[in-house]
From Swiss-Prot:
Region Catalytic subdomain A, residue ranges: 218-330
Main location: Golgi
Record organism: Caenorhabditis elegans
Protein name: Putative polypeptide N-acetylgalactosaminyltransferase 10
Cofactors that this protein relies on: Mn(2+)
């Protein structure tokens, strides 16, 4: 220190530099706008003022000491004092951090709008900056139901009103045009064009939802619809459903993110429509310059959003009545809560709106297929109360902008689609947040069918790469189980994971073992890492025809029947090695596609459908004594066609009918009896 001071003292001619130090630093900090750290910026400006005042004080002191010390010694003392002061300030800044800086060296994706809600406000601004939702607590609870809107919609008439199904006119030209639109969209877009953009839908909420009370003051929302080549009327109906069924004081904006669509109707005509119908003040369109994919499309919409809460929806949706307050109220109570609505069904053929079910918890199997877990007994007792869900379905959820950006938004290393729902779900739970489903918030969704309308993204196996990124960052040692069940994932190149691992470290997130034991605590019961032994397996021979059930490697929604048993005809081929699993469903060996019957009519069809391990339509019981395969939901028994050539169906049980008698190749009677007894207890 002394040596430096003497050296500086020898350079008296440059003493003006030190006097300019404070001014220069202050100017640079101000012009930079303290982007990296608002707190540091405020501190820097104050520090520069202190430096300036210190120099003025030094000048006064030097004037008072001039009669005792030489001019050279004056400057030596001043320089040494200033260096000592700088050293003390540096020591204070370097050691005064009481906790992890959650945003250091981690880019935060914020939009540049002047009205933007700052997702990471400086702690120095007070409690409201740390928790901006404090102002929404403590208010009276009110009913947000818009009775006038209900009455108005009740008077509507026309195709598809009240969510009723619509049929195509019987006309060859219409059928031809409808088929063309079907192939282009994956749903019946011709029917969509027949239905009003403002159509009414059936209120399919639980009856008690109409009596629910929510905070009288709730945060504002930005609703984000990413889309690519969406059919125009379906997209606009999604928009109008949100506008018509949302309190105007809560709906700040709707953002349509056009992911490089080429359809002419989605270009300038879309913006002209918004302007002509005077909704361009609330609906704005963002357009990408290249194909970004669903994940980055959502991220871009979030960056541009100005609402306090971000709501992500698919662009082929219709919001139900009073859908918004149930999503917002839990977030107002705790901004780290993510809320998902119940997702109902818009039929891809007829546009009928119908409920999917009355709730289930989201989960996954070890090949990373999205699955559902049954509600706990406690959750079933409160049909209107939000309940914890380990994993979101992906396309429908509400999250505070503050929490979304604290989590780093979506991992921008994920391409197109796939894995984003696991990535966000895991980090919400593991990083000290919570995720719930809100039964009184319902949004209907079109599940595309028959045709895959979009071009290949040309990015190789992006889904495996996405899964690898999620596994490497969040799943710890459990990732090996995923790699075992989905081998392509383990060999994929995950890319640079430094940023996402840095977020996990700085947020001090919990382990995946904690997630599996505390949040997805019963997943192993329904989707175990090791497949449990089957109760019965092998061929299922029909006594009346002496033929065996053959699923013939068919896919979802396809029917099947009987063929000559492969044990009788070694060259016959087919798919006859079946399993009666611990979940009481019947599936071909090595495949997760199950026997399914959804109706109780006479001769109800039996189809193949993705296994969900939740019983219901896929629950079958083998009655050993009668050799019947009983379906409790329909109350009927599996029946073969008389000549053995038709499809299998369900029919009223008749113990005397050989067409309803089935002989499994191998049956573990003790295991079967135990499992069926346990299943009966669960139903009590």
């Amino acid at each position: 220190m002394v040596a430096i001071c003497i050296k500086i003292g020898e350079r008296e001619r440059k003493r003006v530099h030190i006097m300019l130090l404070a001014y220069t630093w202050k100017t640079r900090v101000s012009s930079h706008q303290c982007n990296k750290s608002p707190i540091f910026g405020l501190f820097a400006i104050q520090f520069s003022n202190i430096c300036s005042n210190l120099l003025l004080l030094q000048q006064k002191l030097s004037m008072g000491l001039s009669r005792y010390l030489s001019r050279r010694h004056h400057w030596v003392i001043q320089y040494c004092g200033l260096l000592l002061f700088l050293y003390l300030i540096y020591s204070y800044v370097a050691t005064s951090n009481d906790g992890p800086n959650l945003h250091e060296d981690i880019p935060v994706f914020q939009g540049q709008g002047k009205d933007r809600a700052n997702p990471n406000p400086p702690a120095a601004l007070g409690d409201e900056a740390l928790d901006p939702f404090e102002k929404y607590r403590g208010h009276e609870k009110i009913k947000w139901e818009d009775e006038a809107a209900y009455e108005k919609e009740k008077r509507r008439e026309g195709p598809g009103e009240w969510g009723k199904p619509v049929k195509l006119p019987e006309d060859k030209e219409v059928e031809k045009e409808a088929l063309s639109l079907y192939k282009a969209n994956g749903y019946n877009a011709y029917i969509s064009d027949m239905i009003s953009l403002n159509r009414s839908i059936k209120d399919i909420r639980h009856k008690e939802c109409k009596n629910m009370m929510y905070s009288a003051k709730l945060p504002t929302v930005s609703v984000i619809f990413p889309f690519h080549e969406e059919h125009n009327s379906t997209l606009l109906r999604s928009v109008y459903s949100v506008i018509n069924r949302s309190p105007p004081e809560l709906l700040k904006e709707i953002i349509l993110v056009d992911d490089f669509s080429e359809k002419p109707a989605l270009r300038q005509p879309l913006e002209d429509f918004l302007k002509k119908n005077k909704i361009d003040h609330i609906v704005k369109v963002l357009r990408t310059k290249k194909r970004e994919g669903l994940i980055r499309g959502r991220q871009l919409g979030a960056q541009d959003a100005t609402g306090e809460i971000l709501i992500f929806l698919d662009a082929h949706s219709e919001a139900n009545y009073n859908w918004l307050p149930p999503l917002l109220d839990p977030i107002a109570e705790d901004y780290r809560t993510v809320v998902c609505p119940f997702v109902d069904v818009i039929d891809c053929e007829t546009y009928e709106v119908r409920p999917q079910d009355e709730g289930a918890r989201g989960s996954f199997d070890w090949a990373f297929n999205y699955k559902r877990l049954p509600l706990t007994k406690k959750d079933r007792e409160s049909p209107t109360k939000p309940f914890n869900s380990p994993v979101m379905a992906g396309g429908y959820f509400a999250i505070s902008a503050k929490w979304f950006w604290e989590l780093g938004g979506y991992d921008e290393g994920l391409d197109i689609w796939g894995g984003e729902q696991y990535e966000l779900s895991f980090k919400v739970w593991q990083c000290h947040g919570r995720m719930v489903d809100a039964p009184c918030s319902r949004v209907a969704h079109i599940y595309r069918c028959k045709y895959a309308p979009f071009k290949n993204a040309g990015m190789g196996d992006f889904v495996s790469r996405n899964y690898k990124r999620v596994a490497e960052v969040w799943m710890d040692d459990y990732k090996e189980t995923l790699y075992k069940h989905r081998p392509g994932v383990g060999n994929a190149d995950a890319g640079d994971l430094k940023l996402m691992k840095g977020i996990r470290e700085k947020l001090q997130c919990k382990s995946f073992d904690w997630f599996m034991k505390e949040i997805a605590f019963d997943q192993d019961k329904y989707y175990p890492a090791v497949e449990p032994k089957a109760s019965a397996e092998g061929e299922i021979r029909n006594v009346g025809t002496n033929f065996c059930i053959d699923t013939q490697f068919k896919e979802q929604n396809q029917r099947f029947g009987l063929r000559k048993c492969t044990s009788d005809d070694k060259d016959g081929g087919g798919e006859q090695d079946l399993r009666l699993t611990r979940w009481h469903d019947i599936r071909p060996k090595g495949r997760k596609i199950c026997f399914d019957c959804s109706t109780s009519v006479d001769k109800a069809p039996v189809i193949l459908f993705d296994c969900h391990s939740m019983k219901g339509n896929q629950l079958f019981k083998y009655r050993v004594a009668q050799k019947q395969i009983y379906h409790p939901i329909s109350g009927q028994c599996l029946t073969a066609d008389e000549n053995g050539k038709g499809f299998l169906h369900m029919k009223k049980c008749d113990s005397s009918s050989d067409l309803q008698k089935w002989a499994w190749q191998t049956v573990d009677n003790e295991l079967l009896e135990t499992r069926q007894a346990n299943e009966a207890k669960e139903q009590e």
